[in-house]
């Protein structure tokens, strides 16, 4: 458009030698302020503006006539004026001013072009390659750019904005007060016509924009106004009644040039800027003005033709390469502070609304698109690219847009979303499924099938779309369901090492398991555990491998070893680790009930496997069967046995990892009891009764008795569920050989049938027995804490029984100081129980009572000490560690009475106590020394003598234990170590140099380390007499000791000693001055 007019042609008759500064000075002269504008009357402001424009034009002409240095600039301006196709003078002073300003701007462009043409930069100096190259002469300084920007603002304000029709662009009155004054002083009736003025200004501005230095300054500030003018010039309808002014002024060629120029500048500028300006031109929904006072100030709505045009142009921007990013940036950039720059909450809400708006725009197929499928095929890869921006500041908003678009498209067009969004996102894992066909050329052993970047990006994208968005749309769930087994295998692999996608895999699995229907979730867990072989998994020829940047790659498997035992071991260990990881995963699924449902499923599966005997599984082949049939039969038997082992292994892991909170509602408890009863009935049918099965049956029936006994507030719906147990209870009561269980089953049937209105003593006794098998220190509130389905009101009501039964006894549910004699006796009896968990729990309860200074427990301190000492000899670590804790706490309360007994027990020989018991007493003494702290000085003599005697014990383990306790004691004594420091040092030197056992020598050197660490800077005072001997000992160990661990301890001790001596010889300077105030 600009190149077609004469304004773009370079002047030929005048030698352009005028300087750049002269042109800019002339422009400054036009912009110089005029007379006073202090009056507040509007008419006065108009007059001041017109007078200023006239005076500035007159001053410019006078400067041209009087100043000889400006003659060349005047000649250049006159030549450009002769070439121009528009009138420079008019009755409207605003247009005369605008015309002269445009001519000077063209002069500026010609001067810059000539400077560039004459510029000949010298060759760079090879000796100084780091020097900056010569600056182009058309580069404007900061002050020159400000002058040019001011001139542009006047040109746009006087020559473009006043001639835009209502609804096109931002009205001039709404911008500034000066804009309102300009709108009033412009005379639209004067020649040239308003449309011609707009065309001339837009053409000259586009001509100026062809110069690189000027174009960026023009479009960065005034692109919207120029685009609005071109839209009006090229697309405003011409058929009007009466005929409009556009039709009278512009030719069809000029309108075509305007359309072409609009598309050219839209392609030329920064695309987010183009999108933002087009949205501004398109305008928002019409908002009617109800206030009469403000009706004149309401902004006119954009015309229909302009809205359609902007919509079409925006769609073209969108469907260009990287068009999605341009649209998103155009809407979001510069709007981080919210709609009105308000508070953080308002800004966040505004961002969410904008993201939803962009998602709707992207998810809606434009009308000019050939088909919805072609549109989504083009933009969906760009939507996926929004997840992978590196700039953290903008990545959050872009990811939010991408996630919202993902969800919107998945709801409105699930087929296209699955084809163009989900499949490309999940492709790295889909091509490695067991059901996929991998080309043989790719299966080179060790070849990378999925790179670290691809797999990390896939997992991160799935996490953002599924977990962060948190919208369980059916197409999303269905697309991820076939890949769950691969995700679980990936999760198991990440547990073996450090990887940044470990937590992402776990969150994805937990999210999908919770959002799936319960049947599908259980089926997925079956696939995880290996019970369901039909679930797609990782291709058998593929494997995961750790990558270099903390990620994971998928490679083709290496050649398998011929060692069958090694292969079998790898297979078994892999299955075992996967089951362990499945248990860890289900730990997070207890509250939602999934863990309980899967546990019940495993119990039912076990019952079915017990019911199915080999003969019932498949008929035994006859002697005339073929070898193929025999092999098939043997394969089925092996698979059956393998499935049984898998179920048993899975149940063992679940029982080990799951807590008592696994069941969250009554239905799950009933299902658990039903599975147990069915298994018991199956065992009776095969005459396979066992002690373990009998105990399990008693426990499950006791659990029902607890529920019926009032620990849970049961509703009528709960009794409807409990009635499912009636047939099984009847079968147990008729066929089970144990009369006690028979009677309990019959009584439970009666209690369930009567909804708890009648209950026998057998039910109450079973409930009490079940509760007593729990930890006496716990509150029996499992069922009441896990689910809102189970009310807590039942704990406040008496049991609903016919003959009255005592409620559950909880040993420490009362506050400290309120323990009854009966409760104390029960815990003492539990401390002697043959069951390890019961005994250990009772010991810990007694220790807790001692720690809380319970009066009833402290009165029986001798009895408690006896119980703790007896349990020290127990072989189970849970029991003897609980006893050690109890003795240590008791010694803290009564050190004088108990410490003597402990020292005697520790100092006794092998004939009285086993070495293991003496080691446990040594652990107690170490804890007692730590607990006493500074009070240990009172018992210094007996402790040190006992430990020094222990160093001479024939048992090497006891010698090491004594040295460890001695080191702990020396750390606590500090200065009080002085009287015995020589004895201790001599002992350590002798042991470290002469003892035959390496563990004892290590312990001796470690005592020196503890001694130096405990004393720190006090070592030079406490150990002043023996410090040199200890140093010689440590050097001896470093040089001559064959054991590396002892050498390491000695080196650490030398480092401690070096630090102590440095601080002693060179104390840190304190920059302080002592000031004494005289009286």
From Swiss-Prot:
The gene is Tango6. Gene3D superfamilies: Leucine-rich Repeat Variant (1.25.10.10). It is found in: Membrane. It comes from the Eukaryota. Pfam families: ARM_TANGO6 (PF23565), RTP1_C1 (PF10363), RTP1_C2 (PF10304), TANGO6_N (PF25267). Keywords: Membrane, Phosphoprotein, Repeat, Transmembrane, Transmembrane helix. Disulfide bonds: none annotated. It comes from Mus musculus (Mouse). Belongs to the Tango6 family. It is a single-pass membrane protein. Residues 785-794, 802-818 have a biased composition (Polar residues). This is Transport and Golgi organization protein 6 homolog. HEAT repeats lie at residues 864-902, 937-973. InterPro entries: ARM-like (IPR011989), ARM-type_fold (IPR016024), Rtp1_C1 (IPR019451), Rtp1_C2 (IPR019414), TANGO6/Rtp1 (IPR039600). One of its GO terms (cellular component) is membrane. The chain crosses the membrane at residues 473-493. Residues 767-818 are annotated as: Disordered. Signal peptide: none annotated. The modification Phosphoserine is found at residue 561.
